[in-house]
Amino acid sequence: MQAAGLAAGVAFAPKISSSNVGSSSSSLAGVRMVASPKAQLRHARLPAASASMYSDAKYDLNNYKFEPIKESIVAREMTRRYMTDMITHADTDVVVVGAGSAGLSCAYELSKNPNVKVAIIEQSVSPGGGAWLGGQLFSAMVVRKPAHRFLDEIEVPYEELENYVVIKHAALFTSTIMSKLLARPNVKLFNAVAAEDLIIRGDRVSGVVTNWALVAQNHNTQSCMDPNVMEAKVVVSSCGHDGPFGATGVKRLRSIGMIESVPGMKCLDMNAAEDAIVKHTREVVPGMIVTGMEVAEIDGSPRMGPTFGAMMISGQKAAHLALKALGLPNELDGNYKPNVHPELVLASTDDETASA
């Protein structure tokens, strides 16, 4: 089997381990993509420019003409679909706040159940958080084993080393998981939308207060600009750490007295940090689950720096906590049986794993 794509002159070929033979998940699940040093760069034979890869109709690039359209049609199509999404998710099952690596992994895992409506709120125009690059603006992404099994599932190629794998560019992970996630009909990503506050009923989080991110950033320069709301059975807070938008979910819980403190993350310790983040991903108050680096903020555990496996697995664990809260089958209760049952690894400090 030939892996799709070539990396900087190095062909990537699948390496199949005996432990993964017979996997029933997606076509490349259980296949490790490793660099083959003897491989030669091969240029695919591309057809002449045509109207479609599946059509013999040729382009005339000197006289290319698009079909005519009214400008109002473009406006109407965008507006109608967005408003329909807002109406659909005004009362939704799960709201994921923050579309970084943990939030995207959580939403991806949730989206496997087509009956669960998932809304993702991201204050930036560009989702992905810090997962577009590795550390110090370098390109490569390091993922410690056994979290590489999640990469196998979503078919991200990597170079396999002894205790970890390396993705040649972090954007391969982020773009791949987004393309798979957003193609699913039960998921909507709301870019450039900020979660300004929480909806609280009694002692339970029941949704989020939303606004356009540019409005949220300019309340001090304009007159009153009231928000919107999104009710949800479960809110997953994956707001990361540091900065004005970091850990906003747990900081708000502290300000209203629902939790005692948010001590902030400790100094870097990769080995302690990743295990702790996955282990302590949890429902901190009824209706609100915390995942990713926001866990380190609320627990005062170490930061982990530029290694990303805990973000992926913490996101998966948060998804199964949300399914549990919804009363649905989940991996934590051992009754998870989706149509496609990928291998799931829940890392912990004592190296316990749950396999599919």
Curated annotation (Swiss-Prot):
<feature type="binding site">
    <location>
        <begin position="122"/>
        <end position="123"/>
    </location>
    <ligand>
        <name>substrate</name>
    </ligand>
</feature>
<protein>
    <recommendedName>
        <fullName>Thiamine thiazole synthase 2, chloroplastic</fullName>
        <ecNumber>2.4.2.60</ecNumber>
    </recommendedName>
</protein>
<keyword id="KW-0520">NAD</keyword>
<dbReference type="GO" id="GO:0005829">
    <property type="term" value="C:cytosol"/>
</dbReference>
<feature type="binding site">
    <location>
        <position position="195"/>
    </location>
    <ligand>
        <name>substrate</name>
    </ligand>
</feature>
<feature type="transit peptide" description="Chloroplast">
    <location>
        <begin position="1"/>
        <end position="50"/>
    </location>
</feature>
<feature type="binding site">
    <location>
        <begin position="303"/>
        <end position="305"/>
    </location>
    <ligand>
        <name>substrate</name>
    </ligand>
</feature>
<feature type="binding site">
    <location>
        <position position="241"/>
    </location>
    <ligand>
        <name>substrate</name>
    </ligand>
</feature>
<dbReference type="GO" id="GO:0005506">
    <property type="term" value="F:iron ion binding"/>
</dbReference>
<keyword id="KW-0934">Plastid</keyword>
<dbReference type="InterPro" id="IPR036188">
    <property type="entry name" value="FAD/NAD-bd_sf"/>
</dbReference>
<keyword id="KW-0479">Metal-binding</keyword>
<dbReference type="Pfam" id="PF01946">
    <property type="entry name" value="Thi4"/>
</dbReference>
<feature type="binding site">
    <location>
        <position position="102"/>
    </location>
    <ligand>
        <name>substrate</name>
    </ligand>
</feature>
<comment type="function">
    <text>Involved in biosynthesis of the thiamine precursor thiazole. Catalyzes the conversion of NAD and glycine to adenosine diphosphate 5-(2-hydroxyethyl)-4-methylthiazole-2-carboxylic acid (ADT), an adenylated thiazole intermediate. The reaction includes an iron-dependent sulfide transfer from a conserved cysteine residue of the protein to a thiazole intermediate. The enzyme can only undergo a single turnover, which suggests it is a suicide enzyme. May have additional roles in adaptation to various stress conditions and in DNA damage tolerance.</text>
</comment>
<keyword id="KW-0150">Chloroplast</keyword>
<comment type="subunit">
    <text>Homooctamer.</text>
</comment>
<dbReference type="GO" id="GO:0160205">
    <property type="term" value="F:cysteine-dependent adenosine diphosphate thiazole synthase activity"/>
</dbReference>
<keyword id="KW-0809">Transit peptide</keyword>
<dbReference type="InterPro" id="IPR027495">
    <property type="entry name" value="Sti35"/>
</dbReference>
<dbReference type="InterPro" id="IPR002922">
    <property type="entry name" value="Thi4_fam"/>
</dbReference>
<keyword id="KW-0784">Thiamine biosynthesis</keyword>
<feature type="binding site">
    <location>
        <position position="130"/>
    </location>
    <ligand>
        <name>substrate</name>
    </ligand>
</feature>
<dbReference type="GO" id="GO:0009228">
    <property type="term" value="P:thiamine biosynthetic process"/>
</dbReference>
<feature type="binding site">
    <location>
        <position position="293"/>
    </location>
    <ligand>
        <name>substrate</name>
    </ligand>
</feature>
<feature type="binding site">
    <location>
        <position position="226"/>
    </location>
    <ligand>
        <name>substrate</name>
    </ligand>
</feature>
<dbReference type="GO" id="GO:0009570">
    <property type="term" value="C:chloroplast stroma"/>
</dbReference>
<keyword id="KW-0408">Iron</keyword>
<comment type="similarity">
    <text>Belongs to the THI4 family.</text>
</comment>
<feature type="modified residue" description="2,3-didehydroalanine (Cys)">
    <location>
        <position position="224"/>
    </location>
</feature>
<dbReference type="GO" id="GO:0052837">
    <property type="term" value="P:thiazole biosynthetic process"/>
</dbReference>
<keyword id="KW-0808">Transferase</keyword>
